[in-house]
Amino acid sequence: MNVFLSKYVNGVDKKSRVSVPANYRAVLGKELFNGVIAYPSIRNNCIEACGISHIEKLKQMIETLDPYSEERDAFETMIFGEAVQLSFDGDGRVILPQSLMKHAGIEEQACFVGKGVIFEIWQPQNFEKHLKSAQKIAHEQRFTLRNAN
């Protein structure tokens, strides 16, 4: 399966290492790079992570914007300028940069949340707050998916 699913909470050690869930690594294993691309989310106070193929799709979408527009500059700066390639160690862990941990408020635990083509890494309590909001919105908008053909 090529989809990031489920939610996992893993500990972050004193060296900022965290284990990426095995099924996420299996999805990423189909990529050319043995690791993950991570960048600060522009939607939430979390880290977004994906494989190189998704970064290529983002690049194609951003390239459709006017090359001199503020929007394109902002997307290129926030996604490509802030992105880091995190390699897996022998135990399936990555080292989270302090800048990304600070952006997401991550200290001792990280909550991995599958979002289909990407996954997010949250501070667990912040994700629980976000989940409550998402549940409300999903319930209110549940009929939207009916017409999503």
Swiss-Prot record:
GO terms for cellular component: cytoplasm; nucleoid. InterPro entries: MraZ (IPR003444), MraZ_C (IPR035644), MraZ_dom (IPR020603), MraZ_N (IPR035642), MraZ_sf (IPR038619), SpoVT-AbrB_dom (IPR007159), SpoVT-AbrB_sf (IPR037914). Residues 7-54, 83-126 form the SpoVT-AbrB domain. It holds the Pfam family MraZ. It comes from the Bacteria. It is found in: Cytoplasm, Nucleoid. Belongs to the MraZ family. CDD domains: MraZ_C, MraZ_N. This is Transcriptional regulator MraZ. It comes from Rickettsia akari (strain Hartford). GO terms for biological process: negative regulation of DNA-templated transcription initiation. Forms oligomers. The gene is mraZ. GO terms for molecular function: DNA-binding transcription factor activity; transcription cis-regulatory region binding. Its main location: cytoplasm. HAMAP family: MraZ. Keywords: Cytoplasm, DNA-binding, Repeat, Transcription, Transcription regulation.
